[in-house]
Amino acid sequence: MNKKNIHILMIDDHPSMIEGYKSILSFNDLGLQITTTPAYNCESAYNIISTTPVAEAFDFAFVDLSLPPYLEKNIKSGEDLALLIKNKFTKCKIVILTSHAEAFILDNIQRNIAPNGLLVKSDFTADEFLLAFEKIYNNHIYTSKTVVENIAELHEKNSFLD
């Protein structure tokens, strides 16, 4: 049986995280052959995004939020990269992976980027990461537990203040 090939751009300033994501995804139950392109900072990610033809669009982009910036191109974080990816590769599924658990940051990400997935790194195990990937692959939105709880709490506080 031929496996479907998908191409994933993985952006994280910790190479071990990228290796971990790749290892976990190799156990997917979807019959997918996964090809990855790594980037370790905003500059390398920008260069990959800008030189990849639209016809060779990435199927997924896993983007860490906190990355060394590329100030020459006004790319300050993973948020800027995610917006760049979203604008160029309109069918690419964006998954934001972050250590930030602050409700206002998470809410801002959802409002500004509207990613297909938003996961707080301390929330997920290998199994949950794989589940998130499979759900997103099947056109569902996935948010990890901390995202759901903290944004709900923020919205409760905001509605109380209104």
Model-derived segments and spans:
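Conserved acidic segment of CheY-like receiver
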Residues: N5-L25
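Acidic, metal-coordinating helix/loop segments flanking the phosphotransfer/catalytic sites
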Residues: P38-F60, Y70
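His-Asp phosphorelay/catalytic-motif detector in bacterial-type signaling
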Residues: A57-F60, N87-K93
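The short loop immediately C-terminal to the conserved phospho-acceptor aspartate in CheY-like receiver
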Residues: S66-E72
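Short amphipathic alpha-helix used as the core "switch/output" element in two-component signaling
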Residues: E72-K91, N108-R111
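Short, conserved "switch-loop" micro-motifs in signal-transduction and mechanochemical regulators
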Residues: H100-A103
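Short, flexible helix-to-coil linker/hinge segments that flank and couple to helix-turn-helix
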Residues: D107-R111, P115-G117, D123-D162
